[in-house]
Protein backbone atom coordinates (compact mmCIF):
# COMPACT_ATOMS: atom_id res chain seq x y z
CA UNK A 1 0.00 0.00 0.00
CA UNK A 2 2.82 2.39 0.82
CA UNK A 3 4.28 2.14 -2.68
CA UNK A 4 0.85 2.69 -4.23
CA UNK A 5 0.26 5.77 -2.07
CA UNK A 6 3.67 7.20 -2.98
CA UNK A 7 2.87 6.65 -6.66
CA UNK A 8 -0.47 8.48 -6.30
CA UNK A 9 1.26 11.39 -4.56
CA UNK A 10 3.90 11.61 -7.30
CA UNK A 11 1.24 11.41 -10.03
CA UNK A 12 -0.73 14.21 -8.38
CA UNK A 13 2.38 16.39 -8.22
CA UNK A 14 2.80 16.09 -12.01
CA UNK A 15 0.03 18.67 -12.43
CA UNK A 16 1.91 22.00 -12.80
CA UNK A 17 -0.61 23.93 -10.69
CA UNK A 18 -0.24 21.55 -7.72
CA UNK A 19 2.66 22.38 -5.41
CA UNK A 20 1.86 20.13 -2.45
CA UNK A 21 -0.12 17.06 -1.42
CA UNK A 22 -0.50 15.31 1.93
CA UNK A 23 -2.36 12.23 3.18
CA UNK A 24 -3.07 11.57 6.88
CA UNK A 25 -4.96 9.00 8.90
CA UNK A 26 -7.78 9.92 11.30
CA UNK A 27 -5.27 10.36 14.14
CA UNK A 28 -3.26 12.97 12.20
CA UNK A 29 -0.40 10.62 11.36
CA UNK A 30 1.30 11.65 8.11
CA UNK A 31 1.02 8.74 5.67
CA UNK A 32 2.77 10.55 2.84
CA UNK A 33 3.46 14.02 1.51
CA UNK A 34 5.17 15.89 -1.30
CA UNK A 35 6.03 19.50 -2.02
CA UNK A 36 4.82 22.39 0.13
CA UNK A 37 2.81 20.24 2.56
CA UNK A 38 4.87 18.43 5.19
CA UNK A 39 4.63 16.42 8.39
CA UNK A 40 4.15 19.59 10.44
CA UNK A 41 0.81 20.21 8.66
CA UNK A 42 -0.64 16.71 9.22
CA UNK A 43 -2.38 17.32 12.54
CA UNK A 44 -4.17 20.49 11.47
CA UNK A 45 -5.12 19.02 8.10
CA UNK A 46 -6.64 15.92 9.70
CA UNK A 47 -8.80 17.87 12.18
CA UNK A 48 -10.27 20.57 9.89
CA UNK A 49 -12.66 18.25 7.98
CA UNK A 50 -13.87 16.81 11.29
CA UNK A 51 -14.82 20.29 12.50
CA UNK A 52 -16.38 21.15 9.14
CA UNK A 53 -18.56 18.01 9.29
CA UNK A 54 -20.06 19.31 12.55
CA UNK A 55 -21.47 22.30 10.65
CA UNK A 56 -23.89 20.14 8.64
CA UNK A 57 -26.92 18.19 9.82
CA UNK A 58 -26.63 15.63 7.01
CA UNK A 59 -24.36 12.77 8.18
CA UNK A 60 -23.75 11.70 4.57
CA UNK A 61 -22.44 15.14 3.60
CA UNK A 62 -18.67 15.12 3.02
CA UNK A 63 -17.39 18.70 3.21
CA UNK A 64 -14.36 20.04 1.39
CA UNK A 65 -12.40 22.60 3.38
CA UNK A 66 -10.85 25.28 1.15
CA UNK A 67 -8.24 27.66 2.52
CA UNK A 68 -7.76 30.43 -0.03
CA UNK A 69 -5.12 33.13 -0.27
CA UNK A 70 -3.76 35.40 -2.99
CA UNK A 71 -1.10 32.77 -3.72
CA UNK A 72 -3.25 29.66 -3.94
CA UNK A 73 -5.71 27.25 -2.36
CA UNK A 74 -5.41 24.26 -0.05
CA UNK A 75 -8.33 21.84 -0.48
CA UNK A 76 -8.88 19.25 2.25
CA UNK A 77 -11.32 16.35 2.24
CA UNK A 78 -11.78 13.29 4.42
CA UNK A 79 -12.41 9.91 2.75
CA UNK A 80 -13.34 7.19 5.28
CA UNK A 81 -10.34 7.13 7.63
CA UNK A 82 -7.99 9.11 5.36
CA UNK A 83 -7.71 12.85 4.87
CA UNK A 84 -6.17 14.29 1.71
CA UNK A 85 -4.96 17.86 1.19
CA UNK A 86 -3.93 19.38 -2.13
CA UNK A 87 -2.16 22.76 -2.40
CA UNK A 88 -2.74 24.49 -5.74
CA UNK A 89 -1.19 27.76 -6.81
CA UNK A 90 -3.16 30.49 -8.52
CA UNK A 91 -2.33 30.63 -12.21
Swiss-Prot record:
Gene Ontology cellular component annotations, sorted alphabetically: lysosomal membrane; lysosome; Ragulator complex
Single Gene Ontology BP annotation: regulation of cell size
Keywords of the record: Cytoplasm, Lysosome
Cysteines paired by S-S bonds: none
Localisation per UniProt entry: Cytoplasm; Lysosome
Cross-referenced InterPro entries: LAMTOR5
Single GO MF annotation: guanyl-nucleotide exchange factor activity
One Pfam family matching this protein: LAMTOR5
Spans traversing the lipid bilayer: none
Functional note: As part of the Ragulator complex it is involved in amino acid sensing and activation of mTORC1, a signaling complex promoting cell growth in response to growth factors, energy levels, and amino acids. Activated by amino acids through a mechanism involving the lysosomal V-ATPase, the Ragulator plays a dual role for the small GTPases Rag (RagA/RRAGA, RagB/RRAGB, RagC/RRAGC and/or RagD/RRAGD): it (1) acts as a guanine nucleotide exchange factor (GEF), activating the small GTPases Rag and (2) mediates recruitment of Rag GTPases to the lysosome membrane.
Binding partners and assembly: Part of the Ragulator complex composed of lamtor1, lamtor2, lamtor3, lamtor4 and lamtor5. The Ragulator complex interacts with slc38a9; the probable amino acid sensor. Component of the lysosomal folliculin complex (LFC).
Family (UniProt): Belongs to the LAMTOR5 family.
Protein name in UniProt: Ragulator complex protein LAMTOR5
Amino acid sequence: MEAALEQHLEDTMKNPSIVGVLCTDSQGLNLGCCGSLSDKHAGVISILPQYAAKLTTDPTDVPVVCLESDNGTVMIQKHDHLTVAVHKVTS
